[in-house]
Amino acid sequence: AASPTYGVPAAVYHDGWAQNGAIVSPHKVEGIELHLRYQGTEAGPLFWAQYSFLGLDPVGLKDEYCPSYFHEMRNLTLVNRAYCIRNPKHYKGFGPDCWGLTASYSVDGYAAHSPNEQEEKGVISPTAALSSIVYTPEYSMQVMRLLYGMGDKVFGPFGFYDAFSETDNWYPQRYLAIDQGPIAVMIENYRSGLLWKLFMSHPDVQAGLTKLGFNTNKQDVRQK
């Protein structure tokens, strides 16, 4: 959007992603309020709350569709956790210290695990909770401690493996780079905000956000 020569028009965002405003659909999932509805779903995999915000700082970020992207993404994370605690399909291991549904390896290949009975398969993806540390630091640390205590079943030379299922006794010792990267980035963003600061300081980023109608209010602080 910020390109001075071939920048896409703001309408690409407003008419495309925001669906002419139809993206705004206040509703509750697991008793938690969400303001937006992506692709017609109530709540999706946790990468929705993470990948866009590895560099783009959600703290205080808002536009005409969402009054606070940080709080929206935090609530999306809390929905994911609450669903795993409720555990309607009674999967082994799910609970307050073991939650996190997102796209990852799965027992039958690869799947976008989400907090609903149609799209979750009893698979916990460590990246889901760990990359959410900017939104739910205490809850994410609880998961990290539990996983670390599970030892080499879920932890290897490059960190936590991509996914596992206690119900299926499935502990593949393999990684997926697109899931590993956000863990390191979001831990550093929680610790120092480094990647957010670097990305947001670029003039092209600021110009693009302005063109698309975003603004920030840093009084909208993170909840520790």
In which residue ranges do the predicted regions lie?
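Ser/Thr/Asn(+Pro)-rich, low-complexity disordered segments
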Residues: 1-224
